[in-house]
Curated annotation (Swiss-Prot):
Pathway involvement of the protein, from the record: Amino-acid degradation; L-arginine degradation via AST pathway; L-glutamate and succinate from L-arginine: step 2/5
Gene behind the chain: astB
Catalytic activity reported: N(2)-succinyl-L-arginine + 2 H2O + 2 H(+) = N(2)-succinyl-L-ornithine + 2 NH4(+) + CO2
Name of the protein this chain belongs to: N-succinylarginine dihydrolase
Subunit annotation: Homodimer.
InterPro entries recorded: AstB_sf, SuccinylArg_d-Hdrlase_AstB
Organism of provenance: Escherichia coli O9:H4 (strain HS)
Binding site for substrate: 19-28, 110, 137-138, 212, 250, 359
Keyword list, A-Z: Arginine metabolism, Hydrolase
């Protein structure tokens, strides 16, 4: 059956700032306390979406979350009106304010893990929301992510959205950033590669930085998503690269159809894994980047593998990269050799995503891949699909509501909270989502 990969990109939120909240993510730590530009961040993301849509790649948008997220501050013991809660937390414990104001939901590669209908036992598209419990600021995302996915994929005959796994370390799940799908045409059954960093009883794990994904979580997600057990492989990420800042697998590998583009040191027991994939995926091609050409350190600083590998109708592929790759002589030299070599990659497309990159999120972090048949595509909420009208409307919306300068101190401004709620109210109407945000269901509560 014919099917297409649709990229659903996260729209950067109004409170995008640099707080260094993500231990193990070296870009996040390095840019801590710098001044951010939320308006520019949102526009950089929108331009990527529109450019790819114009090039013929189906593209949609997932809206930001409500931030600062006052309900969690109340759970932490801060009371009074919303303004009083903000004032108290800013004075008594500003680190909590930064956490509940994070714009991290923009990285929708961590929103959920997807199983296309060609891979599932019941023939539906399945989504399991990620619990993201390794980081407090990200663990706050699951409930609203679930509401948003249900508003976008609202046909229960075709889509099944599962709640996140229990919030315990044993079941740490980071979503599609640790998941690849390999195979022929998108509509054919594919091989799902779940990548984990640790498992109970296995001493092979990183020592410097946390392994956020567990094998136990990956196995549970595969069950929830009703993936045919014959179409699943579980593989461990190389713990040494996690300790070098590769906090998700999408920082060291990216797949599309029959191609796996990865670093030579991406996986534990890599040669064994690649042999398994060759045996089980028709026409499988591994493009392994040797450490002698691109080091793991250069991989992390340029986000070479946090790229998008997109298929054209003729079978050739475009590699979507952050600007940092072009600015690194060694990486850019390798990429031009790759273009000249015998493989499906025929074009490099570079985007300026500096605002997101400075927090450790490249092109792949910003998108959630969903393979859909024509019938399933028609069942998606049409208001989220990128086109000229939506692009212009979202740019106008960003111009109206987003600040061009934000520091950690600005997060205590009650006006920022009001601006954010008004903006999301307008956006949820624009995207025909209904009341997906807690403040909408509670009737506002600004006072």
């Amino acid at each position: 059956m014919n099917a297409w990969e649709v990229n659903f990109d996260g729209l950067v939120g109004l409170t995008h700032h640099y707080a260094g909240l993500s231990f193990g993510n070296e870009a996040s730590t390095r840019h801590r306390f710098q001044v951010s530009n939320p308006r520019q961040a949102a526009k950089q993301g929108l331009l990527k979406m529109k450019t790819l849509a114009d090039a013929g790649f189906p593209q949609a948008v997932i809206p930001p979350h409500e931030r600062p997220f006052i309900p969690v501050l109340r759970q932490l013991g801060f009371s009074g009106s919303d303004e009083q809660v903000l004032e108290k937390v800013a004075r008594q414990a500003p680190h909590w304010l930064s956490s509940v104001s994070s714009a991290s939901p923009m990285w929708v590669a961590n929103a959920a893990t997807i199983a296309p209908s060609a891979d599932t036992l019941d023939g539906k598209v399945h989504f399991t929301v990620a619990n993201l419990n390794n980081k407090f600021h990200r663990s706050l995302e699951a409930l609203v992510t679930e509401s948003l996915l249900k508003a976008i994929f609202n046909d229960e005959e075709k889509f099944s959205v599962h709640s996140a796994l229990p919030q315990v370390a044993l079941l740490g799940d980071e979503g599609a950033a640790n998941h690849n799908r390999l195979g022929g045409h998108y509509g054919e059954p594919g091989m799902q590669l779940f990548v984990y960093g640790r498992e109970e009883g296995n001493d092979t794990r990183p020592s410097r930085y946390p392994a956020r994904q567990t094998r136990e979580a990956s196995e549970a997600v595969a069950r929830l998503n009703q993936v045919n057990p014959q179409q699943v492989i579980f593989a461990q990420q190389n713990p040494d690269v996690i300790d070098q800042g590769v906090f998700h697998n999408d920082v060291i590998a990216v797949s599309n159809r029959q191609v796996l583009f990865c670093h030579q040191q991406a996986f534990a027991r890599q040669s064994q894994l690649l042999a398994n994939l060759r045996a089980r995926v028709n026409g499988f091609m591994a493009i392994e980047v040797p450490a002698t050409q691109v080091s793991v350190s250069d991989t992390v600083s340029t986000y070479l593998f946090n790229s998008q590998l997109l298929s054209r109708d003729d079978g050739s592929m475009m590699l979507v990269l952050p600007q940092e790759c072009r600015e690194h002589a060694g990486v850019w030299g390798y990429l031009n050799e790759l273009l000249a070599a015998d493989n499906p990659i025929s074009e490099l497309k570079v985007f300026d995503l500096r605002e997101s990159m400075a927090n450790g999120g490249g092109p792949a972090c910003l998108r959630l891949r969903v393979v859909l048949t024509e019938e399933e595509r028609r069942a998606v909420n049409p208001a989220v699909m990128m086109n000229d009208t939506l692009f212009n409307a979202l740019n106008d919306w960003v111009d109206r509501y987003y600040r061009d300068r934000l520091t950690a101190a600005d997060l205590a401004d009650p006006q920022l909270l009001r601006e954010g709620r008004e903006a999301l109210d307008v956006l949820s109407q624009l995207l025909n989502l209904g009341s997906v945000y807690p403040f909408q269901r509670e009737g506002g509560g600004n006072g």
